[in-house]
Amino acid sequence: MDSSAGPGNISDCSDPLAPASCSPAPGSWLNLSHVDGNQSDPCGPNRTGLGGSHSLCPQTGSPSMVTAITIMALYSIVCVVGLFGNFLVMYVIVRYTKMKTATNIYIFNLALADALATSTLPFQSVNYLMGTWPFGNILCKIVISIDYYNMFTSIFTLCTMSVDRYIAVCHPVKALDFRTPRNAKIVNVCNWILSSAIGLPVMFMATTKYRQGSIDCTLTFSHPTWYWENLLKICVFIFAFIMPVLIITVCYGLMILRLKSVRMLSGSKEKDRNLRRITRMVLVVVAVFIVCWTPIHIYVIIKALITIPETTFQTVSWHFCIALGYTNSCLNPVLYAFLDENFKRCFREFCIPTSSTIEQQNSARIRQNTREHPSTANTVDRTNHQLENLEAETAPLP
């Protein structure tokens, strides 16, 4: 690292690694990924949470109207679809008893992380348009930490789902004891605790800074800053991408071998069909996650190792990587709707309730009330019976 990367060195806006005095771009406060030395890179937004708080510096010093409209439209679509879809997934899992399986408990955790991530998009959009962070220091800390929490919790949950599928396919007897909703909830809590190992420090490191008339939401590092920034990026690359992807690859490799070598896993064709269907759904969700997140991780690690000159292609590539990462947060509900019959049926019942569905819900409520208040239920039954007798007695004779 040369002297230009020393403490206090700040590059100008012609450099994509320019400081936060440049006009912010979406995800700007989440960017540690473009480091030109000790100064946290303000001109490179980082959706992945690999970055601190700065923005990609447009060549003109401010975004063009077409760029701004395009980014705002994309973020708005992702935000609306992501929030609605993920909250619908969580509602379906909580609402329907049949959906409370171990796999769906993990899906609930994934939907929660994705919903939190998409909830930060309105703040990023305002930051992009205004060229400054107007929401104060507390929200700065919350938004940055949510970004890191989402990244780590999502990949840890997908890792857990892959291991869960491996146990279900390759060790079906052990799966009966291990794969329970209660254990799945405990594992979810553990995933959030593990994610706190990065989420909480980032929350304390996040702060707002005033630079040349604008406010930036950024991460602060001890000296030498360039060392700690690059160390953070490398650790995130290893623990939030390389290792989980290796674990997922091994699990699915073993599952594929098992599925090819054994014609029947459970002794029942119907159970086997469901097992393979769920395994396929989890595999697709994992594959989409890897496709959406690989570009940003590769981009960030390359940026940490070499200097990439500012070009139109570089700017477009960066925004494409960010958009791809955000898009993953709203894709999962769509995948569930197409790949899982139970989710598809529950989504349909929620959006277009039929008379039979309403009757089933009413019957379920009546049964629940009967269990919770047996004396009241008996009183209601007696009252209804008395009313029926009274109506029969007072009815006109034929």
Swiss-Prot record:
It is found in: Cell membrane; Cell projection, Axon; Perikaryon; Cell projection, Dendrite. A lipid is attached at C351 (S-palmitoyl cysteine). Phosphorylated. Differentially phosphorylated in basal and agonist-induced conditions. Agonist-mediated phosphorylation modulates receptor internalization. Phosphorylated by GRK2 in a agonist-dependent manner. Phosphorylation at Tyr-166 requires receptor activation, is dependent on non-receptor protein tyrosine kinase Src and results in a decrease in agonist efficacy by reducing G-protein coupling efficiency. Phosphorylated on tyrosine residues; the phosphorylation is involved in agonist-induced G-protein-independent receptor down-regulation. Ubiquitinated. A basal ubiquitination seems not to be related to degradation. Ubiquitination is increased upon formation of OPRM1:OPRD1 oligomers leading to proteasomal degradation; the ubiquitination is diminished by RTP4. Disruption phenotype: During adult neurogenesis in hippocampus, increased numbers of granule cells maturing into neurons, larger granule cell layers and increased numbers of granule cells. Belongs to the G-protein coupled receptor 1 family. Keywords: Cell membrane, Cell projection, Disulfide bond, Endosome, G-protein coupled receptor, Glycoprotein, Lipoprotein, Membrane, Palmitate, Phosphoprotein, Receptor, Transducer, Transmembrane, Transmembrane helix, Ubl conjugation. The gene is Oprm1. InterPro entries: GPCR_Rhodpsn, GPCR_Rhodpsn_7TM, Mu_opioid_rcpt, Opioid_rcpt. Residues 362-383 are annotated as: Disordered. GO terms for biological process: adenylate cyclase-activating dopamine receptor signaling pathway; adenylate cyclase-inhibiting G protein-coupled acetylcholine receptor signaling pathway; adenylate cyclase-inhibiting G protein-coupled receptor signaling pathway; G protein-coupled opioid receptor signaling pathway; locomotory behavior; negative regulation of cytosolic calcium ion concentration; negative regulation of nitric oxide biosynthetic process; negative regulation of Wnt protein secretion. It comes from Mus musculus. The lineage of its organism: Eukaryota, Metazoa, Chordata, Craniata, Vertebrata. Disulfide bonds join C140-C217. The keyword Nucleotide-binding does not apply. This is Mu-type opioid receptor.
